[in-house]
């Protein structure tokens, strides 16, 4: 189960590799689902990153290892827990998203994230 104090891989080209989730802003529970807005602390970065280690950042969860039931027929699970870094106005920091994202993120009004990726599931 994905909850607070979980490490997330970053799936964009912002220069950050991993963040530690410290708060869920979408819900007031500990559980985290796809499409939730989270607050995290940077734990691992690239050498050329403009962001600094241990800064507080915002992110949107796009992939989880947990099984997701779609239309009561299909189960989807990904290989890792991933998020995309955004600013306070929900604009993405990176200019590309690596990997696939689910199509139902479009219904949650994350259209800017939806336009940066190539693969959908």
From Swiss-Prot:
GO molecular function, one term: structural constituent of ribosome
Entry protein name: Large ribosomal subunit protein uL14c
Transmembrane parts of this sequence: none
Claim: Metal-binding is one of the keywords in the record: no
Alphabetical keyword list: Apicoplast, Plastid, Ribonucleoprotein, Ribosomal protein, RNA-binding, rRNA-binding
Record note on quaternary structure: Part of the 50S ribosomal subunit.
Function, as annotated: Binds to 23S rRNA.
Pfam family, one: Ribosomal_L14
PANTHER family, sorted: 50S/60S RIBOSOMAL PROTEIN L14/L23 (PTHR11761), LARGE RIBOSOMAL SUBUNIT PROTEIN UL14M (PTHR11761:SF3)
A biological process from GO: translation
Compartments in which it is found: Plastid, Apicoplast
Record keyword Ribonucleoprotein present: yes
Main location: plastid
Similarity comment text for this entry: Belongs to the universal ribosomal protein uL14 family.
Any single Gene Ontology cellular-component annotation: mitochondrial large ribosomal subunit
InterPro entries: Ribosomal_uL14, Ribosomal_uL14_sf
């Amino acid at each position: 189960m994905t909850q607070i104090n979980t490490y997330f891989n970053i799936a964009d080209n912002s220069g950050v590799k991993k963040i530690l989730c410290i708060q869920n802003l979408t819900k007031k529970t500990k559980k985290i689902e796809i499409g939730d807005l989270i607050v995290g602390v940077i734990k691992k970065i690239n050498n050329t990153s403009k962001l600094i280690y241990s800064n507080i950042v915002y992110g949107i969860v796009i992939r989880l290892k947990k099984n997701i039931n779609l239309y009561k027929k299909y189960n989807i699970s990904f290989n890792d827990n991933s998020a995309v870094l955004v600013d306070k106005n929900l604009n993405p920091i990176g200019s590309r998203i690596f990997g696939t994202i689910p199509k139902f993120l479009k219904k949650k009004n994350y259209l800017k994230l939806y336009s940066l990726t190539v693969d959908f599931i």
